[in-house]
Every structure is written in C-alpha cells, then in structure tokens.
C-alpha cells in the first residue's frame, strides 16, 4: 500500500495497536508504548491549523543547568545522521540556542555500535566517548546499567509504557517498516513482502544495516516474519524468508543508505518509514523515490534516548534531553516524519500543525512487540542470521 497520508488512518493504526498491547501482559514500566499513546485522546482537540501553543505545564531547563552545560563546552552524540528524523535541524537549533557545539560520532552507526562506544570509553572522557544515545527499544532495558537516570521537565507527558520508571531511558519517537525504492532502477516498486522474491528484483533488495547489530535491520527481519507465517512470538520465519531472498539472487549484501539507493547499488531498501520519506523529499524526483508500507507484516518500531553513565559532559547531556523532549524538539522530529512520543499531549493542547500531522503515512494495522517479545526476537535474529541466512552485510566504501 502506498503512503497515502491521512491522520484518521494513522489514528486507526494506533487504536489497533492499543488493543494489541492491552492483550499482552508485561511488567509495569517496561511495556512498549502502545501506539495509542500517540493518538489524540477521545474528545481532545484536533491538530491545529497553525500550531499555536497552549501551555505545557512544564517548566523549561533551569538557568543553573544551562550555565553548567555551557561550562562543559560541548556535547558528544553518536549515530545521528542529519536526515534521520530531521536531526540536522534538531542539532543546529540546540547549538544556536545554547551556543554548545556538538561532536557527532559515527553518524552511520547502529544501536549496537552506540552501546559498544559507551562500554569502550568508560574510563575515557575524551572525544570518542558519547554523552547520549538514541537506540532501539530493546537496547534500552538490556543496557540500563550503562545509563544515568534523568527525568526531563516534560516527564509526566511521556506515556508510562514508554519509559523506565527511574528515568534511565525513555521513548523518543517511532515509525513503521517500509520499502524505499529508486524507481529509475526498479520501475515497479514492490508492494508486499512476497514481491521481494520476484525475479524482477534480482540483485536489488537490501537492508539498511547489519541484522546482527542494527536495530533497523533486525526489525526488518522481524517484520518479514509477520508476513510469512510467523508472529510476534516467532521471528524464525523472518530469517527463513531472507534465506529465500538470498537464494533467489535478489539480496544485495550491502548496508543501504541514501547514497547507495540513489546510485542504484541498493535500489530497494527496507527502512523505517521516516527515513524513506525524508530521503524521498531530499531527492526532489532526481531520482524519484517511492515509499511503501507493505500490505502485510506491518510493524512499528520505537527508539529510546538515554544519557551515558560515563558522559564527559553530563550537564550538556541533560540539557540536550530537555531540548529533545520540549514541544519544540518533538515538533522537529515530526517534521522528519517521526511520530514523537509526546504526540498525544501536544495534540490535546492544539499545538501540532495540521500539515505535519497529515504527512504521517497510512500504516493501519501495524503492530508493536512487547519488550519481552522484542528481546526474544532480537536474540534469535542476531544469533541466527549467520546460521540461517549466511551472508555478511557490509558497509559500502565512502
């Protein structure tokens, strides 16, 4: 199904996911956010035409925090491509507002790379030590001991199901898995998972990331399982499906990125909807990029933010979090097609511009795994890729 953009259909997705979560019993404080947490609550205000704000009821960062952050002289982030969730604007606005330069490490890195960077630099306060991470949902609770708890001013407006009770990590945004296609190479973009096995896509199908370490790639395999006889409790059919894609000669063992998609090296890439849509906009039809949420196996994925327990700039890290979870920061993510975790609060106060809300893709029926399901699937996929699929996914040369 193509990315027809209607808020009503998105709300339908959220309601369906809310039902799913209601049926899944998991420990309090660790459940994945029900997509219903991002939909306008019944009877609340619709997105505003102009985005005029109503008070959030939350104070901004204190003058003491701002001064302490500025005194540290910088902030180190990791794995934040400027075109991912509109991070370019988020980064630039932070520096412009507070005068704090940002050292961005490994923009093409995976969630696994982010965790390894924290571990490798526990006693190193230098420029290679990240202050903050933006990682896949399953990486949050699993690595909680590496994070410094901190609750932002808008903490109470973040759904309980989307955060660690002590503030060690909390959801930031989410999207759905989609097919991003360079139509200059693949003139007939695939619409569903079964299409990826067709001979016309020989040497064209790629993952955005290594499924042994990348959250995005791991969850692409998980999504494939849902469309091929698996379930949220059984991701093995996803691995089996990719083995079929390889055997058909359709799989390209290259870590897809906007450059490889445009060049035609990875013309059909499995990526989050927000990555595909922002890439589509950036090419201005040269070439034309098509973004499709598949008909079956519709799968939603949440990311989380956390501060490293070993952050060289702990106050700058806290100020960064305040920036991200402010109304301003959340709307910047929305501009990049990412559904911010505080969406329902902002909609209820009438500050979400209608044009931004209307850009979210039609993803009716998408499901979100619980933390337990996601952990089990992640373990299976990361450990089973080599045995079942047997292909290395390599990063293309610069």
How does the language model describe each region?
Residues 2-14:
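Bacterial N-terminal signal peptides that target proteins for export
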Residues 47, 51-62, 70-89:
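Extracytoplasmic "Venus flytrap"
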Residues 50-51, 259, 362-398:
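Conserved C-terminal helix/tail region of periplasmic/extracytoplasmic solute-binding proteins
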Residues 76-92, 103-119, 126-265, 279:
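Extracytoplasmic ligand-binding site segments that recognize negatively charged/polar headgroups
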Residues 174-178, 239-244, 250, 284-309:
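Periplasmic-binding protein-like
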Residues 298-299, 303, 308-368:
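Mature extracytoplasmic/periplasmic domains
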């Amino acid at each position: 199904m193509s990315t027809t953009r209607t808020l009503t259909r998105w709300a339908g997705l959220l309601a369906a996911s809310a039902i799913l979560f209601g049926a899944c019993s998991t420990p309090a404080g660790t459940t994945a956010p029900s997509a219903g947490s991002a939909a306008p609550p019944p009877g609340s205000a619709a997105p505003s035409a102009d985005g005029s704000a109503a008070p959030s009821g939350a104070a901004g960062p204190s003058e003491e925090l701002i001064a302490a952050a500025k005194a540290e002289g910088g902030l180190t982030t990791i794995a934040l491509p400027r075109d991912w969730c509109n991070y370019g604007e988020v980064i630039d606005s932070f520096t412009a507002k507070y005068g704090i330069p940002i050292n961005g490490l490994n923009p093409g890195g995976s969630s696994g790379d982010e965790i390894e960077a924290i571990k490798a630099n526990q006693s190193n306060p230098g420029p290679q030590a990240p202050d903050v991470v933006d990682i896949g949902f399953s990486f949050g609770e699993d690595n909680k001991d590496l994070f410094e708890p901190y609750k932002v001013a808008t903490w109470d407006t973040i759904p309980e199901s989307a955060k660690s009770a002590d503030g060690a990590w909390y959801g930031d945004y989410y999207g759905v898995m989609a097919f991003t296609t360079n139509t200059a190479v693949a003139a007939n973009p695939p619409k569903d998972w079964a299409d990826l096995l067709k001979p016309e896509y020989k040497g064209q199908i790629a993952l955005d990331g290594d499924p042994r370490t990348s959250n995005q790639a791991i969850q692409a395999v998980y999504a494939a399982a849902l469309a091929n006889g698996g379930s949220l409790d059984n991701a093995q059919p996803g691995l089996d499906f990719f083995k079929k894609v390889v055997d058909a000669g359709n799989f390209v063992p290259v870590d897809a990125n906007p450059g490889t998609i445009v060049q035609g090296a990875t013309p059909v890439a499995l990526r989050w909807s927000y990555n595909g849509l922002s890439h589509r906009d950036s090419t201005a039809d040269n070439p034309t990029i098509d973004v499709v949420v598949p008909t079956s196996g519709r799968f939603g994925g949440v990311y989380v933010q956390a501060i490293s327990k070993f952050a060289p700039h702990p106050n700058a890290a806290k100020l960064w979090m305040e920036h991200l979870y402010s109304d301003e920061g959340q709307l910047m993510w929305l501009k990049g097609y990412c559904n911010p975790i505080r969406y329902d609060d902002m909609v209820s106060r009438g500050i979400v511009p209608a044009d931004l809300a209307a850009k979210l893709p039609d993803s009716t029926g998408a499901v979100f795994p619980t933390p337990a399901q996601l952990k089990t699937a992640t373990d299976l996929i990361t450990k089973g890729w080599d045995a079942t699929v047997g292909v290395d996914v390599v990063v293309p040369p610069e």
